[in-house]
Amino acid sequence: MAISDVPAAAGTTATTTSDSDLRQPSLRRRSSAGVLFDAARDSGSDNSLTGKITDDDNIKDHKPNNHAASDDNVGAAANDAGQEHRQPVADFKYAYRPSVPAHRRIKESPLSSDNIFRQSHAGLFNLCIVVLVAVNSRLIIENLMKYGWLIKYGFWFSSKSLRDWPLFMCCLSLAIFPLAAFVVERLAQQKCISEPVVVLLHLIISTVELCYPVLVILRCDSAFVSGVTLMLLTCIVWLKLVSYAHTNYDMRALTVSNEKGETLPNTLIMEYPYTVTFRSLAYFMVAPTLCYQTSYPRTPSVRKGWVFRQLVKLIIFTGVMGFIIEQYMNPIVQNSTHPLKGNLLYAIERILKLSVPNVYVWLCMFYCFFHLWLNILAELVRFGDREFYKDWWNAKTVEEYWRMWNMPVHKWMVRHIYFPCLRRGIPKGAASLIAFLVSAVFHELCIAVPCHMFKLWAFIGIMFQVPLVLITNYLQNKYRNSMVGNMIFWFIFCILGQPMSVLLYYHDLMNRKGEVD
């Protein structure tokens, strides 16, 4: 066997023919190029090495004596079986030749600033999960050894909550208001009442639906959990009633425009004449959406096994959330002072200490409600649109966060507040301010009413988002593709804003209870 005088590259072997008169060397490529590909991968994952081998093959195969080349091919085919077992040895011998360049192009380190966001960090993510589990497991064991079992079941399963029959009856009576709205819409469809009367009746129905539970909670010394549950349900029903009335009003207006022969955009999907049915209203009231429409995308069937697994997850994560609240957050809050009245450094220390368990509770709450519960409800009623949230954790601005973290409310705001304001000629900034104002009012109602006090901390916290939106938008426009806004969002929401709100409401609530006692 002779070696070609042309420098051979990785993955090639030299063979001789069986003809004694023609001893011309022939360079033949191996059929399996595993080692060659390994060499190419180690040298930079480019094709230059393969190209070099191909060029060398062409040089050696380009002979003036065609008969010799033909004999070489015949000899190579005949010796395939004999050469097969010698291929690994030859590949190993010629795979990493010193003459082959190891550095072929300009490349960045994987963790350099220009290349770090192009890499996959799945391994580091797994490492963070392992470290997080290990560290928190140690902290839980240390906490239990030091303080013991601090969970008080009375906060979650108190007999007082079971005896809140006025709140329970008020919760059941909320079904009256959708029925009243349906009667109004039927009368409007039959043209028994004029449009101004329809608007007035819907205004009365929605106002009474919102004020009636507030009065019941304030009149009754109910448990906090019962009051929060009733207020959340009240706000959901109110938002649904507004959407139901507004959508039917818009459909009547479109029907009139269609009867006049006006051209409507293709994006409008509705049947003429539209009909008001109790079935569509009943489905809307139980569906995991706040925006009414006559039909929704539906899934073909209910996955019972999947629902059971999600219910198990819901129970587990709800228990984890309750454990963190009782075992960590309550002792921290009870051993703190009012953040606006005590020592500043001590208040900062309490806020920072409260921030970590608060982040866990907030993430568990989001996962339990927006992912588990809403998906369970959607599966049971075969609701097809499961986009209840987007990747809000990657939000670069506060505005992006509010657009992505709660999609049912965001769609309601856009459909019934923001764009109606724009169609009325209101500027975009003012329309956004109105949307935040509505959100702030309902956040305050859901917290202040069950606490039986109106300190406006939740209202101020939501309205404070407006300057944060301007600041983070400015930073995003100035520093393109930066995560400065994302860091500000995480700091304001989880490190400063929510722990501060918890301390403020707790101490104000304790002061109120002390005054009452």
Curated annotation (Swiss-Prot):
It catalyses: an acyl-CoA + a 1,2-diacyl-sn-glycerol = a triacyl-sn-glycerol + CoA. It comes from Glycine max (Soybean). This is Diacylglycerol O-acyltransferase 1C. The lineage of its organism: Eukaryota, Viridiplantae, Streptophyta, Embryophyta, Tracheophyta. GO terms for biological process: triglyceride biosynthetic process. GO terms for molecular function: diacylglycerol O-acyltransferase activity. Residues 53-64 have a biased composition (Basic and acidic residues). Residues 1-82 are annotated as: Disordered. It is found in: Endoplasmic reticulum membrane. Its main location: endoplasmic reticulum. GO terms for cellular component: chloroplast envelope; endoplasmic reticulum membrane. A motif (FYXDWWN motif) lies at residues 388-394. Involved in triacylglycerol (TAG) synthesis. Catalyzes the acylation of the sn-3 hydroxy group of sn-1,2-diacylglycerol using acyl-CoA. The active site is at 443. Residues 8-17, 71-81 have a biased composition (Low complexity). Belongs to the membrane-bound acyltransferase family. Sterol o-acyltransferase subfamily. Keywords: Acyltransferase, Endoplasmic reticulum, Membrane, Transferase, Transmembrane, Transmembrane helix. The chain crosses the membrane at residues 121-141, 165-185, 197-217, 222-242, 272-292, 305-325, 361-381, 429-449, 451-471, 484-504. It comes from the Eukaryota. It is a multi-pass membrane protein. It is an enzyme of class 2 (transferase).
